[in-house]
Amino acid sequence: MDSSFPDWNIEFREQNESYFMESSSCDMSLAMSLLSIIIAIIGLTGNVIVLQLLGFHMHRNAFSVYIFNLSGANFLFLCTHIVFSLENLIRQFHYIDIHMALFSVNVTILAYLAGVSMITAISVEYWLSVLWPTWYHAQRPKHTSTVICTLLWVFSLLLTLWNWIICKVLDYIYNWDMCWKLALIIVVWLLVLFVVLSRSNQALLFRVFCGSQQTPVTRLLVTIMLTALVVLICGFGIGICFFYWKKEENSIMPCGYFYETILLLSGVNSCANPIICLFVGSIKHCQFQCGTLRLILQRAIQESPEEEDEEVEEVVEQEGGEEDEESTTL
């Protein structure tokens, strides 16, 4: 009897198991890429609606300015998110030995940094409004939100341009040390943002449930808390991925097999805010109530307690009626 037969049988079984694992991994990667594209399309639609309503159909306040800029950052991020998901999807059928588009990478970095900065600024500002309500409503400069959003966009843009110049224009190979230090600076900035975001939300929770002077729960507070929770759970992975990508000298597939998961979570992070606004704005007295998208968004960013809802709805309906009359006249 040929003694090599058992070895051949074992080798054949190992090859079958390897093929099955590779096939299952490919199917999972394909499904996650398709799911990422679907999530990105939903997120783009939601953020466009928020941008349109806050930009042209609603009066802005301090927090709506932040939410408007957050939606803008999420919109930019999701645009490049679709590019990366499509690229990953194509690789399932045909290997392409190209790096991700330079423009898309830089826009992703800019949008991601700006988005995390905006939600942190929203959380800190709400915490300040709860901690010092008299100063906030009486002495706070009128255009503080606009100034802060502008500074955050500029700072995010400077970090992105610095990354592009040092790691691409001046050649990554000859400036590896500088590029690595820049990646470290970006990650440290992200860590600062996430620490401030988590601590400010913890302080808000403590003030609401355990403080001597309990703060009333408003829809805006719920919107901020839920959005911050999604960012902390789903948004931190792509920052780690960026750091790892720099460490591995700009590999084509950053973070290896976790790339699809991180891509999916980052898409969820960027499309969560419109869905949260829709969810929070649709609840009234613990029941779902329908209404126009404008009214739902107005409820979601309402600073006053739920008991004062009727006044807000009357104002929104009057404004909507005035706009309808103007459009009819035109």
From Swiss-Prot:
Belongs to the G-protein coupled receptor 1 family. Mas subfamily. This is Mas-related G-protein coupled receptor member B8. It is a multi-pass membrane protein. It comes from Mus musculus (Mouse). The chain crosses the membrane at residues 34-54, 63-83, 102-122, 147-167, 178-198, 220-240, 261-281. It is found in: Membrane. Keywords: G-protein coupled receptor, Glycoprotein, Membrane, Receptor, Transducer, Transmembrane, Transmembrane helix. Residues 302-330 are annotated as: Disordered. Residues 1-33, 84-101, 168-177, 241-260 are extracellular. The keyword Nucleus does not apply. Residues 304-330 have a biased composition (Acidic residues). Orphan receptor. Probably involved in the function of nociceptive neurons. May regulate nociceptor function and/or development, including the sensation or modulation of pain. One of its GO terms (molecular function) is G protein-coupled receptor activity. Pfam families: 7tm_1.
